[in-house]
């Protein structure tokens, strides 16, 4: 018998040839995960994950997990996904659907025990799931699907953690629809070693070298978790998520992926689906996913969720003037945005490590130390988009995107407030 061993620090994967009917992520990719100890950075001993032999339970389970049921039945598996009681955790459960579907309206509503997720009292615990968006399931393959849902009381009222409902109202406003709001969201995240709550690739209880060599790097001494990032990238493309790129971040063990441009409510649906997929992949890899905006105190970058935003008017000739008016509105609602941009963001927005101070609104061209950054191409072309650098990595994309649309398209400041803000920000609007 051969033992499969896992360290508490460095690891790397060995890919083997998948079964012909294997789905993208449940194939031998993860079952052949090979863990290697980094003796230079950790004295931790190997721990036994499993004992494997030719006729092992692992091999038999793998065969069942990789079954392609499509030739044998029209039925599919739908994984219903919703946001839990913390507002950042994702929950899910599966059900059988009689045939493949093309639209969430073809799916039945469902329910769950809200008392077990912190979303309902025990004496009235039923919460109803409304299917809102569907994606291909990269774990099961075939016609199986992931279903993004929002949650309601039995009376049809959105529960407090259902932020999608309010966002859908904003994005269905005719004034917002006419402006076709685009969003490009940069989701940063940190990978942690299981059981020690310490970044992947870091010596347990210690620190790597200072920041500098890690951003967009390659090499076993600089890049930690690339296989997870790449597996997530491909799984999102398979699912139909509008993922547009990925890169290693400034802090070692931290990564980023980008979703968009997406229109309106779609941006939130795609981010939540991508987060769920990332949680599942890190689960299979034995690594913990953290969306904490400042996972490590000290001279280390935090984790944000920069949100790029434009409207039809911003993208057309003369759009830079529209962008400046939007910046003015955002400055006047700075407190409202900060309060909705993620838990613990005050630990990240310090004015250091490519952030602006949480207490002061600022904007600039190509300045990553500002609240709102405008790219040089936008300034040069006189049209384009703005980047809101304030949202934390654990922000709710439904809240952030709808608030941007509301503040720039639906909310009107008083003339006096507008004039004072324009003078303060040196904006001629």
From Swiss-Prot:
Name of the top EC class for this enzyme: ligase
Tissue: Expressed in leaves and stems. Low levels detected in roots and nodules.
Every GS beta-grasp domain range: 76-156
GO cellular component annotations of the record: chloroplast
Keywords: ATP-binding, Chloroplast, Ligase, Nitrogen fixation, Nucleotide-binding, Plastid, Transit peptide
Keyword set includes Plastid: yes
Location of the protein in the cell: Plastid, Chloroplast
SUPFAM superfamilies (alphabetical): Glutamine synthetase, N-terminal domain, Glutamine synthetase/guanido kinase
Protein name: Glutamine synthetase leaf isozyme, chloroplastic
